[in-house]
C-alpha cells in the first residue's frame, strides 16, 4: 500500500507489543523521554497521593466572594456560630486562578460542607439560609428534574449526600491543609501552595 506524503514525512514507528505503556513521539521526543526516565523516579513510585479538587455540583451556591462571605458571617446570631461558620468557609483556588508558577487568588471562598465531615446544618443557620436561597430542589442530590412555577429545575447528580453537602465526599479534606502542588485540568501551569487553599 502506498503511503501518503504526510505519513512518509511525519510517520513514526511504534512497538505496541510490549507490556510497557506506549506513546507516539518523534525520535527526538522519544530520546528526551528516555533520558528523563533514566534519571527520574516514575510518579507511581513516589510516596504521595494525587487527588482532584472539590466538586460541589453547583458552584453558584457553594463558591462565594468576599462580600457574600462577610454577609453570611454578619447574619450569624452568636459569636460561637460566627466562629464555626468562618471555619467552614475556606479560601479556594479555582483552575482559572492558577498561573505559571503562581496564582492570582480571586477572593473566592468555598462553603466546605464535605459529606465525610458529617456536618449538622442546623449549627450553621446563616449558611443554611444562604444555600436555601438557591432552592432546596436545586441542591438536592437526586438527579431529578423539578417543575417550579413553570420553570424546570435540575437537581445535582444522584448521590447519598445531603442537600447542603458538596457533591463528592472529600474524605481527604485534611490534605488541603498541607503544602501541595496544584494545577488546573485544561492546561499545565503548576503552583506550589503553602497557604492551605481548597481547590476545585
Where do the protein language model's features map onto the residues?
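Polybasic, glycine- and aromatic-enriched phosphate-binding surface used to engage nucleic acids
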Residues: 3-200
Amino acid at each position: 500500500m502506498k503511503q501518503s506524503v504526510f505519513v512518509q514525512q511525519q510517520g513514526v514507528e511504534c512497538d505496541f507489543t510490549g507490556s510497557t505503556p506506549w506513546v507516539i513521539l518523534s525520535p527526538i521526543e522519544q530520546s528526551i523521554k528516555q533520558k528523563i526516565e533514566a534519571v527520574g523516579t516514575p510518579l507511581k513510585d513516589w510516596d504521595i497521593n494525587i487527588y482532584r479538587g472539590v466538586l460541589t455540583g453547583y458552584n453558584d451556591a457553594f463558591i462565594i466572594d468576599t462580600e457574600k462571605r462577610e454577609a453570611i458571617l454578619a447574619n450569624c446570631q452568636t459569636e460561637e456560630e460566627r466562629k464555626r461558620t468562618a471555619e467552614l468557609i475556606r479560601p479556594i483556588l479555582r483552575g482559572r486562578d492558577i498561573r505559571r508558577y503562581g496564582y492570582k487568588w480571586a477572593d473566592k471562598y468555598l462553603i466546605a460542607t464535605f459529606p465525610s465531615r458529617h456536618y449538622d446544618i442546623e449549627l450553621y443557620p446563616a449558611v443554611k439560609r444562604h444555600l436555601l436561597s438557591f432552592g432546596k430542589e436545586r441542591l438536592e442530590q437526586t438527579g431529578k428534574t423539578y417543575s417550579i412555577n413553570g420553570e424546570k429545575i435540575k437537581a445535582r447528580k444522584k448521590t447519598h449526600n445531603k442537600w447542603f453537602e458538596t457533591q463528592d465526599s472529600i474524605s481527604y479534606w485534611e490534605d488541603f491543609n498541607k503544602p501541595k502542588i496544584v494545577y488546573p485540568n485544561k492546561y499545565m501551569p503548576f503552583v506550589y501552595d503553602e497557604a492551605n487553599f481548597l481547590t476545585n
